[in-house]
């Protein structure tokens, strides 16, 4: 199967995940940590719940991690690159959440909610990706079968 389905999977997952995060934040309206409570470098004016950074990292790197465990990628000639990438992706996801709390940009609950919403969105898109992959393979096998009969 061509790379277009994998590229569409990552692009749609990240793009729609960004929109979902914004919609949730506009409904919850939770304020960010204030300079009177914690040290904040630069107070931000927009809402804090859920952490968009944590959600985006979970969705983006999560989709790439998922693809890195699929058969076409595991049989890739440069498969030795996968383990360092997977470690990098997991560390990047975790350290982004830590940095958001450490800098006073988010409460811990905001970051955990960002991870959760990103994971739920990613899970839904993984199911859609698996369905689309099977659908494309069935159509391709029918088309090949019809061509061999002709």
Question: Which positions does each model-derived feature cover?
Answer:
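Short, hydrophobic secondary-structure boundary micro-motifs
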Residues: 7, 34-37
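A short alpha-helix capping/helix-coil boundary motif
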Residues: 1, 23-25, 81
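Membrane-embedded catalytic cores of phosphoryl/pyrophosphoryl-handling enzymes
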Residues: 37-150
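Interfacial segments of alpha-helical transmembrane regions
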Residues: 1-19
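Transmembrane alpha-helix/helix-exit interface in multi-pass inner-membrane proteins
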Residues: 15-32
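Short helix-capping/hinge motifs at transmembrane helix termini and TM-loop junctions
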Residues: 1, 28-29, 103-104
């Amino acid at each position: 199967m061509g790379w277009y389905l994998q590229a569409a999977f990552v692009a749609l997952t990240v793009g729609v995940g960004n929109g979902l995060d914004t919609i949730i934040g506009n409904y919850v309206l939770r304020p960010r940590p204030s300079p009177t409570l914690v040290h904040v470098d630069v107070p931000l004016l927009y809402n804090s719940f859920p952490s968009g950074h944590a959600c985006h990292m979970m969705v983006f790197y999560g989709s790439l991690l998922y693809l890195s465990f699929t058969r076409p990628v595991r049989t890739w000639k440069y498969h030795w690159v996968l383990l360092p990438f997977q470690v990098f992706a997991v560390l990047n996801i975790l350290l982004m959440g830590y940095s958001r709390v450490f800098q006073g940009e988010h409460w811990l609950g905001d970051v955990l909610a960002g991870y959760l919403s990103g994971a739920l969105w990613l899970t839904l898109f993984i199911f859609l990706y698996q369905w689309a992959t099977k659908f494309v393979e069935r159509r391709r096998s029918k088309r090949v079968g019809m061509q061999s009969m002709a």
